[in-house]
Amino acid sequence: MASQTALSARSAYRQLLRATRIAFQDDVRVMIAARQEARRNFDSHRREGIDTPMQINHALEVANILRHNIVQGVREQDDENAKWELRIHDDIERGDNDTIRVKGKTVKVDKACSS
């Protein structure tokens, strides 16, 4: 029977693989590279140690960032002046600059950025 730490590590690894599939859906080259890097990191920390819970937490945080904060842009390969199209999926975190809080205070925007 596997230990709780091993089960947590497997769960984190699976979440990381799912996050790479979502974040890099149409970019096979980048998705494979990200998965190879995840595998390399998990293999290098195969033995359980003092920092294992921190490593598992790090993997979960990376998966969360990949899933909620990474947006890929594409444009036509032949046209350098083509507009970029962003692939925004349902899990992407959305917000605007007016909702950012600084030191617990709401930021008030008085003028447009181009002014």
UniProtKB/Swiss-Prot annotation:
GO cellular component assignments: mitochondrial matrix
Gene Ontology molecular function, alphabetical: protein folding chaperone
Cysteine disulfide partners in this protein: none
Any one of the GO BP annotations: mitochondrial respiratory chain complex III assembly
Keyword Mitochondrion among UniProt keywords: yes
Transit pept. (range): 1-36
Localization in the cell: Mitochondrion matrix
UniProt entry keywords in alphabetical sequence: Chaperone, Mitochondrion, Transit peptide
Statement: the UniProt record of this protein carries the keyword Magnesium: no
Protein's job: Assembly factor required for Rieske Fe-S protein RIP1 incorporation into the cytochrome b-c1 (CIII) complex. Functions as a chaperone, binding to this subunit within the mitochondrial matrix and stabilizing it prior to its translocation and insertion into the late CIII dimeric intermediate within the mitochondrial inner membrane. Modulates the mitochondrial matrix zinc pool.
Homology family: Belongs to the complex I LYR family. MZM1 subfamily.
Assembly notes: Interacts with RIP1.
Identification of the protein by name: Mitochondrial zinc maintenance protein 1, mitochondrial
Protein source organism: Aspergillus niger (strain ATCC MYA-4892 / CBS 513.88 / FGSC A1513)
